[in-house]
């Protein structure tokens, strides 16, 4: 009969310690990697979401009949005229009804998009400046004119700069007098 040596629990402790240390280091590495990649991944995801909103907007606007298209712009012109008649539009805009219906062809709040070629920015513009929306897109500042042109109108568009999760207007400081942008 042969006797095989048995391992004592004290012999296994260094192996267990090594595994625990390895798991802790792996966890720290994964947390660090996640923190490092978050801005890039989040910006990429927001870019996809923004592009999808713009494509959906374009598709719906192109499918509008000329009559519906005219009606949407006439309502925005009417809103702008009513806004111009107010003494303090930025504080009295609530007196005008139908803000959320203006230029809202898809019913999702997108009223257009801004394209700034010089800094490679193309962002959807939504009604209002709700903080959760401004984390991934531009907002039309309520109380300013809708961006449809016209004498005496002044549209104000807002977006964040310097968010780690989305580029948005981060590079706006690279624009110079004379640079152009398009609102569609």
Residue spans for each PLM region:
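Solvent-exposed, non-transmembrane regions of membrane-associated and secreted proteins
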Residues: 17-184
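Short, small-residue-biased leader/transition segments that mark boundaries at the very start
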Residues: 2-9
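Surface-exposed, charge/polar-rich loops and edge strands
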Residues: 12
